[in-house]
Amino acid sequence: VVICVIVPVHNTPKPWLADAVNSIRRQTYPHWHLLLVNDGSTEVGTREFLDNLNDPKITKIQLTRSVGISIATQTGVDAAHGDFIALMDHDDMLAPDALKKVAEIIQRHQSDVIYTDETTFSDRTQEKRDGYLGLPHLKPAYSPDLLLSHNYITHLLVIRKEMIQRAGGFRAEFDGAQDYDLLLRVAEQTDKIFHLSEPLYHWRQSVQSTSLDTGAKPLAHLRGQKALSEALERRKIPGEVLTANAPHFFRVRRKVLGRPSVEIIIPFRDQPLMLRQCIDALMSNTRYDGFRVLGVDNGSVEALTLELKDHYERETDQVRFISLDVPFNFSQIVNFGVQHAKGDHVVLMNNDIEVINVDWLEAMLEHSQRPEIGAVGAKLYYPDDTIQHAGIAIGIGDYAGHPHKHVEGGYPGYLNRLHNIQNVSAVTGAMMMIKRDVYDAAGGFDEQLFKIACNDVDFCLRLRSKGLLNLFTPYAQAYHHESVSRGYEDTPEKQVRFQGEVEAFRKRHAEA
């Protein structure tokens, strides 16, 4: 596989350009070619360096005047001989084995797009909080929804040349967001997009470079927004592109199509005050009116609980109750609720949830309605306003865990992740929306192996194995008074049962 590295050059300080070029020359992979496109540089040092550079593996293209990064890059793409194009900035560096590892992935997976992790580094012209070698950008596996929130892929990006040309190449009107615009178009041509999880790209951040201060690029933000809006039009997605919490971050807000019905299923046993808090919050904090509440009573005995049920059934036809008198088996109770639900979509909700924002239901429904989506999860807070749930990752804790658990509620999270709609491995069953027919087709929660623990994560991984994407949205928010409802795994019997379920989970999902 020949990989052609394209570097548009414009008035680059000579030592930085030397760093970039030498990092390519030091590659352990032999089948590379470097194309330097001089975009009308006027700096003497830059021109001198290029004039003195003689290497059969390096081609120099001289543009008489500056045409901007998109046209300069596309000029390189058009002249490239390789099957694959690697995009690199003129002041950055590649790790010595970067291209070797990329080539291995291409051969192993027949990928069309490969992206790697990266580190930032400072040129010491100013004190960076995180020192000389800065924050590593460790990225997730390909996440179509995170890509609609921002360009999380950035560097190193390697794309099959044929894909770039098929997508229409780089477009000058998107200078500053040209990679993002191209990526969105390429992602419509292929899903063979592979994440190589090693930091093989070193991104220079300096006073002279605008990459340190994202606020210095308002045009880049607007062009990114325009690229996204055009992507929605091409994909025929009714919706709008809003700015999220920071520059270069977006929220694609999709239109809810029609008025689908939603049934919110709440399993409970007594604890009437908590149940009342949960249902009252739903009734007063939900703007969408096409929902009903179905309480599944698992053996309540308190008089106050029975009075509360009577009260709701008298006062509103939006709330009804059914009973299932069996020993506590969360999966069985939830499945029983879904069997009796009448909605197009169901929301599984613990009785210790208290919804916060009035548009929480639309924020989940806009994604649950999509044919490619499995389960949709919400942003849940502990009562002290720290994060309880923002998606579930496999492999942390005993079997799976919550990244960002207990961090301050307003904190943006790692690389702003707490403010972005994104695909995740799993979401919690404490507040999960899913299409009713998808729930049934997947066979619901597993009542045999996962009576109490692991059932939501197991369910999500089964959805994923059917090719569906699970999704976290920060735009549906609720308090979760966690495990107040049934207590923690705090007795020897509970511990034994929990360990058994974890073992069964690890066996079934060894590949995950």
Spell out what each predicted region is:
Residues N22-H31, D280-G290:
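Short, acidic, metal-binding catalytic loop of nucleotide-sugar glycosyltransferases
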Residues P30, N38-R47, R65, D297-L308, ...:
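A conserved acidic beta->alpha catalytic loop
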Residues L63-A80, L324-A341:
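Glycine-rich, basic loop-to-helix element that forms the pyrophosphate-binding segment
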